[in-house]
Amino acid sequence: MELTEKNYKEDFCAKKISVIIPMYNAEKYIKKTLNSIIEQSYQNWEIIIIENGSEDKSPDIIREYEKKYPEIRMIKGSGKGPGPARNKGLKLAKGDYIVFVDADDYLPDTEIFRKYISIAEPTGADIVVSNYVRLWEDKILPASKHEAFALCSPSSEEFRFRGFFSIGTLSYVWCKFYRSEFLKKQQISFSENSYAEDKLFNMQCYICDAKFAFLEDVGYVYRKNDASVSWQYRSDSTENWFKIAYELKGWIEKKQKEPEKYASLIRYLIFFASFFDAKMEYMQYKNSLRAVRKTLKKYGTNPVGKRVFHELADRKRHLYINQRMWEIMIRTFSFGMKQQWYILLAVGIKMLITQRVDERLSDTGVRE
């Protein structure tokens, strides 16, 4: 996007941007993260770092930055994960807009704040979404672009499916520019779930009819860090996903929204979660089909999971996703879950992983 004096008004500079960074053991990357913000051409910002009990030199590095930049402050967190840390940051934020950055990632474009605000202000968007790239061992790799769903109607199932699942860009809080007033008005905050709290956060924004705008430029570099919570095996992952499903259902009821309109969010959430957890079990337990079967059975016998797979397997229920490959995969997998063919599905998942087909389910899941 080319910036000109015509599409960028100087009075936009009065708008403050709050950058919230949860931090835990990030000494290797935090300088690059902070410098990518400090070097922004748009200078009306503050950085709030929530220190979550780091055992390395991360806090010492931040103290040096605090001495030099009064806009940077470090706050002690609870150590309970990124969700509570971001909530603390939201309470302290003074900005008109909110940007979330992970302590091991960075912003590749020094103009990105100007670009975000030049779209958010004239359009009144509650969330501006940019594209992003992935960093794997110092190698930049492209990610699926949001153009695949950005042109869909925001109220459509196609937008929800691509945005939150098959493409997934809407699931992450990074590469986003949030209007602070919208979050406060809708009382949106992060769950204390141990994982995927950002997916729930953004789904809550969507259910509250957030107005989206899209920026074609790359606004974020996502780094694969094996020490981060995103890449750690979690024995309670299945319980966590069902907790998210229950919280999502409760949020729909709280906001008095039409349940059936948003039910597909819960259905696809459980479908993708079951496959993801089965894959993690397979890799954790050294290619154990028994471990995969056990996980699939957890999903298939849970009351919510059981209902979801019955509904997705029902050919009378139309899937408005306009992607034949995905429809076949969802129908077939769900029918197998409905019939309790867990070991057969486990073999199928093994084949997908062996052929690396599973990587197509997530940009952040590609194995280099």
Predicted regions and their residues:
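Short, well-formed alpha-helical segments that are part of the catalytic scaffolds
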Residues: 25-39
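Short aromatic/hydrophobic "clamp" motif used to bind/position activated sugar donors
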Residues: 98
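Cell-envelope/extracellular polymer assembly enzymes that use nucleotide-activated donors
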Residues: 15-18, 36, 46, 200
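A conserved acidic beta->alpha catalytic loop
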Residues: 43, 51-60
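Acidic helix N-cap motif at the loop->helix transition within catalytic regions
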Residues: 28-31, 56-65
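Glycine-rich, basic loop-to-helix element that forms the pyrophosphate-binding segment
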Residues: 74-93, 103
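Membrane-interface aromatic/basic loop that binds lipid-linked glycans or pyrophosphate carriers
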Residues: 2, 283-368
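Donor-binding/catalytic cores of nucleotide-activated saccharide
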Residues: 82, 103-214, 220-236
